[in-house]
Design a protein with these regions (language model features):
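Short, Gly/Pro- and small/polar-rich lid/capping loops
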Residues: 1-10
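Conserved ATP-binding subdomain of kinase catalytic cores across diverse folds
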Residues: 13-15, 21-233, 284-285, 294-329
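An alpha-helical support segment within catalytic cores of ATP-dependent transferases
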Residues: 91-99, 236-270
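All-alpha amphipathic helical-bundle segments outside canonical DNA-binding/catalytic cores
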Residues: 198, 353-363
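Pre-DFG segment of protein kinase catalytic domains
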Residues: 269, 287-290
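Conserved catalytic-loop position in the HRD/HxD motif
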Residues: 273
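Hydrophobic residue at the +6 position relative to the catalytic HRD Asp in the kinase catalytic loop
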Residues: 277-279
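Active-site activation/catalytic loop segments of kinase-like enzymes and analogous catalytic loops
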Residues: 293-350, 365-380
Length: 396
């Protein structure tokens, strides 16, 4: 257990960390939020405490349990019995807790909606150290950046191991008003090839503002372009094994990678997994969310500075993917729509100079080769979307 049990009437809410061990792999830790009620219910799990049986259920599926838990986090002052569980308040929450419920969409973490103005984002799989999403939101809030949600606070604890490893457990963040999912918005317009240039130009400006703030807040470094090129070539060769269709385009892709050799690339803290699904359009403009980086990468790698053009390339590829909503995603007029959208995004962000264009081109190629592997394994009917982009790269 991470903290004292939260009691409300006969309901008890208990956060715990599950330790999953593997004989030949690193251990993993997962956060669970349990609801306990006295008595037994057929078919449900139970535990016995001091001779008293309790039915155990998933508290994230129980609105009464979630509301009780949210009240403690936002209105109370919980203190762990062993000192391992802490609540860190950064800014005052805007309203008292009236109700809480779990967001029903598919997510890698658990989002709890608290009223109309707050989200508690509970991290399921725990990683030692500071959570990037918390770190970046806090820094951008301090810098006065309005294109991210307000961070009200976060919760931290310790993984129950001999070393008492510190870990972030959840963040309490603003629930943005009237949000429209960026992916759903742009793909809906792609169906009829409706012009989106003004929309995506604004998104480019938003990303540039965030990059500038991150550059001033966190340290910047130079990275070896040859090492970046080596990494891209290595990923491409591994991709060819999974997706043999890539083999004929290896020369096209590596030609882009090779232009990085002998260069020193400016690197900084970036978003790390930037695409339309990480954006929301609100009445106040674009907002960018989820600064945890690519979920499949280890935390240590996600913490490393990278070129800002990696984020730009991610959005360029995402705009290309938006054409999947059209009946003929690879038709000339559809590709023209995607090209104009990408150009507008770049205009909003700030067109790269000649040297930076080569960096952007390399990152685009790297992301497209990854996409072909992903589609080969998961959505074979979509393979032609990144493949058509790679074909076009060969014609540049």
């Amino acid at each position: 257990p991470l903290a004292p049990v939260v009691n409300e009437q006969d309901l008890q809410v208990l956060p715990v960390i599950a330790h999953v061990g593997y004989p030949q792999a690193a251990d993993e830790y997962y956060q669970l939020l349990l609801a306990l009620r006295p008595g037994r219910v057929a078919g449900l799990a139970e535990i016995v405490v001091n001779g008293q049986p309790f039915t155990v259920t998933d508290a994230t599926e129980d609105e009464l349990a979630l509301t009780a838990w949210a009240r403690i986090l936002l209105e109370g002052t919980p203190i762990a019995m062993d000192g391992s569980w802490q609540l860190h308040r950064r800014r005052a929450a805007p309203e008292p807790v009236r109700f809480a419920k779990r967001f029903g969409g598919e997510q890698s973490n658990t989002s709890i909606m608290v009223g109309d103005a707050i989200i508690i984002k509970m991290f399921r799989r725990l990683e030692p150290g500071d959570n990037l999403d918390i770190t970046v939101h806090n820094a951008l809030n301090d810098a006065g950046i309005s294109s991210v949600a307000t961070l009200y606070g976060f919760m931290s604890g310790q993984i129950p191991a001999e070393e008492h490893i510190p870990v972030d457990l959840a963040m309490i963040i603003e629930r943005l008003p009237q949000p429209r999912d960026g992916w759903e918005l742009i793909t809906a317009k792609a169906v009829d090839l409706v012009d989106v240039t003004d929309l995506v130009a604004g998104l480019g400006q938003c990303l540039r503002t965030i990059h500038e703030a991150l550059r001033h807040t966190f340290s910047t470094v130079e990275i070896d372009g040859s090492r970046v090129a080596d990494d891209m070539v290595r990923r491409l060769d591994a991709a060819v094994v999974t997706a043999p269709a890539l083999a004929r385009y290896r020369g096209t892709l590596t030609a882009r990678f090779e232009k990085l050799r002998g260069r020193h690339l400016a690197a900084q803290r970036i978003h790390g997994d930037f695409h339309l699904g990480q954006t929301l359009l609100t009445p106040g403009g674009w907002r960018i969310i989820d600064f945890e980086g690519e979920p499949l990468k280890p935390l240590a790698e996600r913490r490393l500075p990278d070129s800002r053009w990696s984020d730009v390339a991610g959005m360029m590829r995402s705009l290309s993917y938006a054409t999947s909503a059209h009946a003929r995603p690879t038709a000339p007029q559809t590709l023209t729509w995607a090209r104009r959208a990408s150009e507008a995004f770049l205009t909003g962000y700030g067109w790269p100079n000649t040297a930076e264009q080569d960096v952007l081109a390399a990152y685009e190629a790297d992301k497209a080769s990854y996409e072909i592997v992903y589609e080969t394994l998961n959505r074979p009917t979509w393979v032609d979307i990144p493949l058509s982009a790679i074909r076009a790269m060969g014609q540049d």
